[in-house]
């Protein structure tokens, strides 16, 4: 006499939660498997977004202390006084393009300390 799938489903449906947990544990031991969900490694994992390696530092506003910002821009870019002043007054403007994340963060920190508003894109 064999048991049908429907009979097994009915038997499990009538069990308490603790009984179902015990049944699952017994089945894991008997068949050497785990009831944990299998992780599918497929094309979705291969299409993961690549981490950006080059960043642009954009001066969005000079802030109240424009002189300090101009000095910081001169030091960071190597521009002359007039060019740095024109760049600061033309905000929003790209200060540096295609720089590393560390360099972009350092430049942002330096300019914000001088009173500027800076974005990294």
Swiss-Prot record:
Family in the record: Belongs to the bacterial ribosomal protein bL12 family.
Name under which the protein is recorded: Large ribosomal subunit protein bL12
Its biological purpose: Forms part of the ribosomal stalk which helps the ribosome interact with GTP-bound translation factors. Is thus essential for accurate translation.
Lineage: Bacteria, Pseudomonadati, Pseudomonadota, Gammaproteobacteria, Aeromonadales
InterPro entries (UniProt xref): Ribosomal_bL12, Ribosomal_bL12_C, Ribosomal_bL12_C/ClpS-like, Ribosomal_bL12_oligo, Ribosomal_bL12_oligo_N_sf
The protein's assembly and partners: Homodimer. Part of the ribosomal stalk of the 50S ribosomal subunit. Forms a multimeric L10(L12)X complex, where L10 forms an elongated spine to which 2 to 4 L12 dimers bind in a sequential fashion. Binds GTP-bound translation factors.
Keywords: Ribonucleoprotein, Ribosomal protein
A GO cellular-component term linked to this record: cytosolic large ribosomal subunit
Record bears the keyword Ribonucleoprotein: yes
A Pfam family the protein falls into: Ribosomal_L12_N
Superkingdom per UniProt: Bacteria
NCBIfam families: L12
GO molecular function, one term: mRNA binding
UniProt record, GO biological process: translation
């Amino acid at each position: 006499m064999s048991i049908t799938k429907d009979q097994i489903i009915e038997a499990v449906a009538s069990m308490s939660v603790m009984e179902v947990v015990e049944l699952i544990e017994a089945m894991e031991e008997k068949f050497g498997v785990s009831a944990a969900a299998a992780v599918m490694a497929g094309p979705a994992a291969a299409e993961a977004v690549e981490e950006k390696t080059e960043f642009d530092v954009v001066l969005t506003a000079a802030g109240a202390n424009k002189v300090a910002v101009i000095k910081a821009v001169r030091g960071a870019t190597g521009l002359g006084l007039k060019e740095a002043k024109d760049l600061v007054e033309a905000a929003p403007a790209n200060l540096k393009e295609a720089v590393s994340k560390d360099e972009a963060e350092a430049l942002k920190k330096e300019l914000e300390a001088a009173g500027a508003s800076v974005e990294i894109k």
